[in-house]
Amino acid sequence: MSVLPDRQVINQLISGHYGDPFSILGMHETSQGLQICALLPDAREVWLVETENGRRIAQLTLEDPRGFFIAQLTRRKKSFRYQFAVTWQENPQIIEDPYRFGPLLQDIDSWLLAEGTHLRPYERLGAHLMSLDGVSGVSFAVWAPNAQRVSVVGDFNFWDGRRHPMRLRRENGIWELFLPGIEAGQLYKFEIIDCHGQVRLKADPYAFEAQMRPETASLISPLPDVVKSSAARQKANDLCSPVSIYEVHLGSWRRHTDNNFWLSYRELADQLVEYVKYMGFTHVELLPINEHPFDGSWGYQPLGLYAPTRRYGTPEDFKAFVAKFHQAGINVILDWVPGHFPSDEHGLSTFDGTALYEYADPREGYHQDWNTLIYNYGRNEVRNYLAGNAFYWMERFGIDALRIDAVASMIYRDYSRAEGQWVPNYYGGRENLEAIAFLRYTNKTIGVERPGSVTMAEESTDFPGVTLPPDIGGLGFNYKWNMGWMHDTLNYMQCDPVHRKYHHNLMTFGMLYAYTENFILPLSHDEVVHGKRSILDRMPGDAWQKFANLRAYYAFMWAHPGKKLLFMGCEFAQGREWNFETSLDWHLLDDENGWHSGVQRLVRDLNHCYRQYAPLYEWDYQPAGFEWLVVDDHENSVFAFLRRDAEGHELIAISNFTPVPRYHYRVGIPQGGHYREVLNSDSAFYCGSNLGNQGGIDSHHVRSHNHEHSLLLTLPPLATIYLLREN
């Protein structure tokens, strides 16, 4: 009897509408022997070659002029390794048949991917250079359970979706194919016939490299090698360690002066690393470097979560960039965006014709503020895609920490939505229980699998337990940005000094909740855009007062409990708002004796002072590490507090937020002795008026502020001073 494929099936296969190509193509054992089918459009002649001896076994018959070939071997019953000798125009070419290879995905991987608990989904999905049965090539795998057909397309097959349709693993909705002869650097996409019969051309969600906008293809790129962590890097992230973060947008920190073009990862590795080290920061935080189609999103609308943007170079270049920071003793934090993604056609949107990665209901799946789509955290495969990506950056690039963007938008279903525009959870509440479960799982997994690596939450509400362990009901982050402290203190500093006495509580309120979370004090990129003005420009007064206010504020911040974060340009008091399309105003530092240089020197000294004196950081999250000395002097706008470390060392910070010098100002202290002035923001070195306490002062046995000892101080105008008790 005939075993020829049905004519309708052949037509569907040739037209690219057949979803089970492996049932037809390749070598099959039948009751009449072996049957070999191949779809090779434009081929003139095809021979079957036995790989073991190179002998031509049979010529395939052109069954359909559109390129469908078939051969019957009635004398052979068992399958064997083979190749095709194909004549396209003139010279024959020996090629491997992708359809002679068996399934790629192992059962355990299939199970874990479907369950959403595969630690490294990026090792199985996407495109992977490999050798299979002695043949070099690339294995492709993509999740598209509702697609009718999925093909790999690229330059290697003329972007023709008919040539390389994939195998569907029905148990998990993953399509897979091994393509021999494909090499690193080649472009590819997935051509999907979706559930509605529409053709969609999609970039690989798991691609390790992608084209830069406006191009949208993925690139074959090797999976980066594992980067081991180190004890020093782990300790640098610890709650008891000094953490001073320099936040950077790589595309606008510095640019080529001749053409305003970006610096490459390699150029940044030389210039930025040296600068961050010189300034004394312990960490650098990068605005998102995942591939993204829109420059104006600053990276916060990524589509290629697994691909470092090619704006600045290759994945290898970025890996070298991170390694250069590590060699300098600086930890690297990456801003990470698992909350939403843009709706660009080549991306995740309606990936297989359905709302696959996003929620189907726009009341859940559409973010009206940003015109983006929200991940469906209720799907195992989506959670796995995101959690695996977090681990990928840490394991494969050595990223030391992730700062998760816009956590509030993830955990609240009614975030920025009016009544009736959101869907309650199962219990009728406003919390997104699926997103909360995802964050807990991701944070816990990182803690177990990558000890010493940490996560930081930009969470703008009072959601309880952000930095508590998931086991006791927390979200499991290590740190949380203190948005309330930032807003309160900036609002205070914007007041004219004569009015500050009426807003005294803005500077003290933060200590009422300082120990509810592990806080970072952020002056981030969000505070110098969208008409908010620069930090310097928010300060009141004439030019001298603006700079003095800023110096006093920075010194107050560096002494206050909580880790520190400062956005680039703020360290030298850039006067304009941040513009992502140009370099920072480095020319402001041309005058070494100018005010901008003075602020830069202050920030550098603050960092070195902060790292040198343990009272400023060791007990950030212990109430015993802080004590108010002067908290209620509204009239003079003076604040004084003491910082203490585990060994009992003490440092006092005193701020005078008026332009009036305070002479003979008495401050009560717990212990008497000699106090050395280790920092004064009014120093002439920082372009201040150089008023102070002549380097140090002895205490008096005079009771004040409920203490038996006190200091009689000179408080410079609009300034903060640090006094270290010497043993």
Curated annotation (Swiss-Prot):
List the pathway annotation: Glycan biosynthesis; glycogen biosynthesis
Source organism (scientific name): Yersinia pestis
Which Gene Ontology terms cover its molecular function? 1,4-alpha-glucan branching enzyme activity; cation binding; hydrolase activity, hydrolyzing O-glycosyl compounds
Protein name as annotated: 1,4-alpha-glucan branching enzyme GlgB
- HAMAP family noted in UniProt: GlgB
The answer to whether UniProt assigns keyword Signal to this entry is no
Q: Which gene encodes it?
A: glgB
Task: Identify the GO cellular component terms for this protein.
Answer: cytoplasm; cytosol
Q: Which domain of life is it from?
A: Bacteria
UniProt lists the family membership as follows: Belongs to the glycosyl hydrolase 13 family. GlgB subfamily.
Q: What is its EC number?
A: 2.4.1.18
Task: Tell me the NCBIfam families matching this sequence.
Answer: branching_enzym, PRK05402.1, PRK12313.1
Subunit structure, as described in the record? Monomer.
A GO BP entry = glycogen biosynthetic process
> Mind telling me which InterPro entries this protein's record contains?
A-amylase/branching_C, Branching_enzy, GlgB, GlgB_N, GlgB_N_E_set_prok, Glyco_hydro_13_cat_dom, Glyco_hydro_13_N, Glyco_hydro_b
